């Protein structure tokens, strides 16, 4: 693969070992503290998560972590992330994974600055007017979540799976 950059309006950075640039890239967007969101063990076993952490450490950006995002992400993980972001004063999300991880990070990003229940956005009770920035180290480019403002979350109580469009 040839390395290249595509911007539309999301900045996409393509190429081998580009995860090593993560720290420099998020620093460019003003990150002061990041929450890394990831799913299961593949990002750990492959060494990807360690390379991303090293990149952040090299530029001095502190971070906290939220793992265990599952396919068809659930609201309880979003609530957990919102609480942790507020406690840790996070100002940028970094999703390391595929669509479910990205959707979770986006939902958390919308929920952190909101004083109500983030689910209000999904049921049309509120509109997202402010959100944390979201960066992505993509592992599975299947859902398209990395290039859209949409996010799909399942509410465990009642098993509602709803989409929020244009965060």
Question: Which sequence ranges carry the predicted segments?
Answer:
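N-terminal small/polar loop signature for handling phosphorylated ligands or for N-terminal nucleophile
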Residues: 44-116, 125
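A glycine/threonine-rich phosphate-anchoring loop and its flanking beta-alpha core
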Residues: 113-165
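Conserved beta-strand segments of alpha/beta enzyme cores
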Residues: 11, 62-64, 133
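Hydrophobic anchor at the start of a short beta-strand
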Residues: 33-34, 63
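Conserved beta-strand elements of the Class I
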Residues: 35-36, 92-94, 135
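N-terminal amphipathic/basic leader segments beginning at the initiator methionine
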Residues: 1-29
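Cofactor-binding loop segments of dinucleotide-utilizing enzymes, especially the Rossmann-like FAD-
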Residues: 38-40, 68, 137-139
């Amino acid at each position: 693969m040839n390395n290249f950059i595509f911007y539309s309006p999301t900045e996409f950075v393509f190429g081998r070992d580009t995860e090593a640039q993560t720290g420099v890239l998020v620093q460019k967007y003003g990150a002061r503290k990041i929450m890394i969101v990831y799913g299961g063990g593949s990002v750990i076993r492959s060494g990807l998560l360690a390379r991303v952490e090293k990149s952040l450490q090299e530029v001095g950006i502190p971070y906290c972590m939220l793992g265990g995002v599952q396919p068809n992400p659930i609201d309880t993980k979003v609530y957990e992330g919102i609480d942790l972001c507020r406690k840790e004063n996070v100002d940028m999300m970094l999703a390391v994974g595929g669509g479910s991880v990205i959707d979770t990070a986006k939902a958390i990003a919308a929920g952190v600055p909101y004083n109500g229940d983030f689910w209000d956005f999904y049921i049309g009770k509120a509109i997202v007017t402010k959100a944390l920035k979201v960066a992505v180290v993509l592992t599975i480019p299947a859902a398209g979540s990395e290039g859209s403002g949409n996010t799909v979350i399942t509410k465990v109580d009642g098993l509602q799976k709803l989409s929020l469009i244009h965060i």
